[in-house]
Amino acid sequence: LGAAEYKEAALRRIRRLKEGGFNAIRGAHDPRSREVLEACDEIGMYVMEESFDVWYGSAGVYGYTLYFREEWEKDLELMIRKCFNHPSVIMYSIGNEISETCTEEGIRYGHEMTQLCHKLDDSRPVTLGVNLMLNILAAQGKGMDAYGGSVMNKADVVDPKACEPDSDQNGSVLVNNMVADFADYMKNVNKPENTDGPTKGIFGELDIAGYNYGEASYEKHHEWYSDRIMVGTETNLMNMKERIEMVRNQPYIIGDFIWTGWEYLGECGVGVIDYNENTGNYNKPYPCIVAGCGLYDLIGHRDTLEYDLMIAWGVRDKPHIAVSHPKHAQDEMIPGLYRSTDAIDSWSFEGYEGIETCVRVASPGKEVELFLNGKSMGVKLLEDLYAEYLVPYEAGILEVVAYDENRNEIGRDRLVSASNETVISVRTEKETMDVGGCLLYTSDAA
């Protein structure tokens, strides 16, 4: 809500995440407000409290990099003192995707920060979200300057709010664009034998090794460093079932933080699906203003992929139907970097009668059966939670039934086409509100 935080809004966000199966949040990539920490204390949500998104290396235009060396100790101490009496805070993170951590100076700063955390609070472990690929590139001299980044100097600052439209790419933005453009190359480079050297120094200073998109290195790194405790500090939703099983089955991996729980402004279109033409990997043109990868949208509605996660976690015990818009039936889909589908839970596509569209079912169990207006569209075995049908659009009721291995029904989901009449209703989420509080509501169209 802009630069302001409200108790009711914080409680609502944390409550929605908790209801959706999350048991921990990571403050990405700056400290959380007191209201958020109080909400986590009240509701029961673990917190990884994170201090910095940059250190002294250039990342972003004239930001904290300019002041890091003189301010980090004071700011880190303030964060720890704020968190000390909040039981929800279970660990501290001293940074995110800091490529300097592949250098001696960066490792020294990591050591000093970890020691300060231990001095002020020896009850909580310390981690850092290391982007393994970013460290590989930096160790090879292919850091920000080599790929178009710029070195920031205080003397250059004329207008802190100014930003040239053709300004250089830095940090995570640069790496994500490189990943999109050179996916095969990155996959070949991002192997355990390559990620070890540029990360073992900083990991040796931390209580818990934080891996950003580094799950391919978990197993080998554990073989080489059997006492290393790991956490997936940042991952995307690709292969999520496999990752969930990995975390459950490997005691040295304590958890997995997914990018991202709540939708946000900026990094425009990183999770937006295109058709026929890629309009940009990380900077799609206006009117795209959101990232498009939140499991909850800006006002807290669940995304299709959040339902998938709930099923994978075992929080939801029935299927979920999502449908691709039939207007794209003949188009080539171009997935976003952080999204593989734009299907939604709707069966209202007036004007597209008879056009085949993809119906995507996520479900627990062994198999599912889809019905359109009472007629079976067939039984399909689930593959990694999913089954897909091509169904000609016809207004009415689309329903799916999930079965276990003994063909016993375990749950249903249904979509009903909207009528021609539009009705706007507003319902409050609470019957009462505290004096001085803010009213939270959702609007529904039926």
Question: What feature does the model see in each segment?
Answer:
Residues L1-G57, V61-H111, D122, V126-T127, ...:
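Active-site-adjacent substrate/metal-binding segments within catalytic domains
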Residues E42-M45, M377, A418-S419, A446:
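Active/binding-pocket-proximal capping segment
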Residues I90-Y92, Q115-H118, V126-G437:
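Substrate-binding clefts and catalytic carboxylate motifs of secreted carbohydrate-active enzymes
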Residues Y441-A445:
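Conserved small/polar residues in nucleotide/adenosyl-binding loops
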